[in-house]
C-alpha cells in the first residue's frame, strides 16, 4: 500500500508540474500539424517525413507499416503522386494529451476536398527532440461514423 501511495504522489506531482506551461507546447504541436498539412498540400513527401523522427513509423488504415524516413519518403511520394492535383487536404487537432513533458498523444481529423475518402482521423505520438516536436508513430483510421 505504501508503494502505491508513493507512485500516486509521484504521478500527481508530475501531472501538476507538466500541466503548467503547456500552452507553448500545445501551440508548437498545432504548428507542427499545420506544417504536415502544408507539406501534404504541396505533395512534398520529403517535407512530410522531415516532421517524423528518424525511426518513426506510420500505418494508414489497412495499409502496411512504413518505418523510417527513407521508406516513408518513397511510399509517400507514390501516394501523393496519385492524389488529384486539385484536391486539398485539411488537418485539425482534436485533442492533445501529454504523457510527459516531451511526449504527447495527438488526435487529428482530416478532410479531403475530393476523392473516394473525404475524411479520416489519426492518432500520433509526438516526441520533443532537440526542442522540436516530431512524430514517432502515426496511425490513421476511417472517420468516426455519425451517431
Outline where the language-model segments fall:
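Bacterial N-terminal signal peptides
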Residues: 4-15
Amino acid at each position: 500500500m505504501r508503494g502505491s501511495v508513493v507512485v500516486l504522489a509521484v504521478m500527481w506531482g508530475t501531472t501538476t508540474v507538466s500541466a503548467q506551461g503547456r500552452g507553448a507546447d500545445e501551440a508548437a504541436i498545432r504548428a507542427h500539424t499545420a506544417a504536415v498539412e502544408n507539406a501534404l498540400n504541396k505533395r512534398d513527401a520529403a517535407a512530410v517525413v522531415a516532421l517524423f523522427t528518424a525511426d518513426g513509423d506510420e500505418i494508414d488504415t489497412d495499409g502496411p507499416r512504413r518505418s523510417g524516413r527513407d521508406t516513408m519518403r518513397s511510399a509517400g511520394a507514390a501516394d501523393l503522386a496519385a492524389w488529384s492535383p486539385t484536391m486539398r487536404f485539411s488537418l485539425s487537432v482534436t485533442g492533445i494529451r501529454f504523457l510527459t513533458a516531451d511526449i504527447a498523444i495527438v488526435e487529428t481529423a482530416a478532410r479531403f476536398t475530393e476523392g473516394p475518402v473525404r475524411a479520416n482521423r489519426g492518432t500520433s505520438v509526438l516526441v520533443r527532440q532537440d526542442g522540436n516536436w516530431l512524430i514517432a508513430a502515426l496511425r490513421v483510421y476511417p472517420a468516426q461514423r455519425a451517431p
